[in-house]
A protein has these predicted regions:
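Conserved phosphotransfer microenvironments
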Residues: 50, 54-70
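C-terminal output helix
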Residues: 107-119, 124-129
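Acidic, metal-coordinating helix/loop segments flanking the phosphotransfer/catalytic sites
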Residues: 20, 32-52
Length: 131
């Protein structure tokens, strides 16, 4: 099985390391960044290799996680997106991209793995339906 690359954007270093470890233990390759700006740089530079995004909502500087996901969907309309946030969940319906998942902090790592795996599997099922 080929390795799937997830772009992980979280500005709290300890959380970033925890999320990165959990994703790697689940078999994913991880591009970990600490800002929305760095996330966009990776998306634009390596758009074909990123299979999904896990992003915090609020960063110290623009762009926000909402913006990262919207731009990712401009590049790839089916890009799986998991939002992670401590206080932005109420805005998900109005700010989030369609067919995304919101996980509220704090959460157990298995929730993160299940969420991104579900979206990746849904995407693969959609591709298989088209073939």
């Amino acid at each position: 099985m080929e390795s799937v690359t997830i772009l992980l954007a979280e500005d709290e270093t300890l959380l970033l390391l925890d999320f990165e470890d959990a994703l790697k233990e689940a078999g994913f390759m991880v591009l970990a960044v600490t800002s929305g700006k760095k996330a966009l740089e990776h998306l634009k530079a390596a758009e074909s290799s990123i299979a999904g995004i896990v992003t915090d909502i609020r960063f110290a500087e623009s762009p926000s996680g909402w913006d990262v996901a919207r731009i990712a969907r401009e590049i790839d309309p089916e890009m799986p997106v998991v939002y992670i946030s401590g206080d932005s969940a109420p805005d998900w319906a109005s700010q989030g991209v369609p067919k995304s998942i919101m996980i509220e902090k704090p959460f157990v790592m298995s929730q993160l793995i299940v969420a991104i795996s579900q979206l990746l599997n849904d995407r693969r099922a959609g591709v298989a339906d088209l073939e």
